[in-house]
Regions:
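Extended alpha-helical targeting/anchoring segments
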Residues: 1-372
Length: 373
């Protein structure tokens, strides 16, 4: 936790690095209850109209508040705000060397210790939830559910040191480090939720995973397997169709296009299947319109989205928080970029948590899904 809030949006994957550092906000906008959301979004829009830059996070549960039919599903005992956005004068661009220097200045070499690591569910509890998902799929309620649980742990030391250590092990294009007086958010997300440049919108959902091989030959085989596996392709295509529909709610008619399907991206520990979608935004679309149409990302709910979110609330029980929400920025011009907040740690005075999970479809296997999770 920190007295002076900051947001580091960290692309450590692009050669040379490409990060944005936001410090000393003029104002912090947050919402903890559904009744506060509308005013908070208006305050963000007003700040942008004044030439300020917005950066921070939207929690997964914000999506429940944006849809009247789902608001009653909001879980009690939430640890983080529904949204936390700082309004800043302008970000400081950093290359990789500059980012590492800033991290070092703020405690990257200090102590960071995790202990008492444990899952929120037992294997038996996961199996019960998995079977319930399969029943819903068999009944025709949904085609896919993204079922998640959490690691909880004790933490001692400097959150910046933990982020720096994780960053060294996993280079990603959509990382983030957020410091507030009440919590820290550390995200090593490889997944782009959406990017807006002028009226151009792009999204890159990620669905489908394979481990890296122990040898170059095994690694190539696993990458080829992921690219060709029918189950992985089917899961990916479901989410592509969902996001095409979501983008269509804010896009010019006929402008939504799939740029590529089933592209495999390679990271240090896994191969990931991604696809690309682009669209041209209608001129009358503002922040609220975009969030109501797109949030949360379909890759972390399942399809169809609204019914999937109802089932997630029933089976998971606990709030996801920042995990599977979105972290990013909005410029005064309206340009914006947000990640899907996967591979994300939240630290507060009570310790830390990290959500994990995966998509379940009709032919999923409980043993395999538990092992992957």
């Amino acid at each position: 936790m920190t007295a002076s809030p900051y947001v580091l949006l960290d692309d450590s994957l692009t050669p040379g690095g490409r990060s944005l550092l936001y410090t000393e906000p003029e104002r912090v906008v947050s919402a903890h209850e559904p009744g506060e959301v509308e005013a908070a979004l208006d305050a963000i829009s007003a700040g942008l109209a004044r030439g300020l830059h917005a950066a921070g996070f939207f929690s997964y549960e914000l999506g429940l508040c944006l849809e009247p039919k789902l608001e009653g599903l909001l879980p009690a005992g939430r640890r983080v705000p529904l949204l936390w956005i700082g309004l800043f004068r302008a970000p400081r661009p950093l290359d990789d060397a500059g980012t590492r220097a800033w991290l070092e200045t703020n405690g990257a070499a200090e102590r960071a210790k995790i202990s008492d690591l444990h899952l929120s569910w037992s294997r038996e509890q996961y199996a019960q939830a998995f079977n319930a998902v399969e029943d819903y799929i068999a009944a025709g309620d949904v085609y896919q559910i993204n079922l998640t649980l959490k690691y909880h742990f004790a933490f001692e030391g400097n959150p910046v040191a933990l982020y720096a250590a994780l960053r060294r092990k996993q280079r990603v294009a959509h990382g983030a480090l957020i410091g507030t007086p009440d919590l820290n958010v550390l995200s090593l997300s490889p997944e782009l939720f959406f990017r807006r440049e002028g009226k151009h919108m792009s999204a890159r959902p990620m669905k489908g995973t394979a481990p890296r091989g122990r040898t170059p030959r095994e690694d190539a085989r696993l990458k080829t397997w992921l690219a060709m596996d029918e189950k992985q392709r089917a899961e990916n295509l479901m989410i592509v169709d969902l996001l095409r529909n979501d983008l269509g709610r804010v896009a010019k008619i006929g402008s939504v296009e799939v740029t590529d399907l089933f592209t495999v991206e390679t990271y240090r520990s896994v191969h990931q299947m991604t696809s690309g979608i682009e669209a041209e935004l209608r001129s009358d679309m503002g922040l609220k319109d975009m969030l109501r149409a797109l949030f949360p990302c379909g890759s972390v709910t399942g399809a169809p989205k609204m019914r999937a979110m109802e089932i997630i609330s029933e089976l998971e029980g606990d709030a996801r928080g920042v995990y599977t929400g979105a972290i990013g920025y909005i410029a005064p011009s309206g340009d914006a970029e947000f990640n899907v907040a996967i591979r994300t740690v939240v630290l507060d005075k009570n310790g830390g948590e990290m959500g994990i999970g995966g998509g379940i479809v009709a032919d999923s296997n409980a043993h395999d899904e538990w092992a992957e999770t």
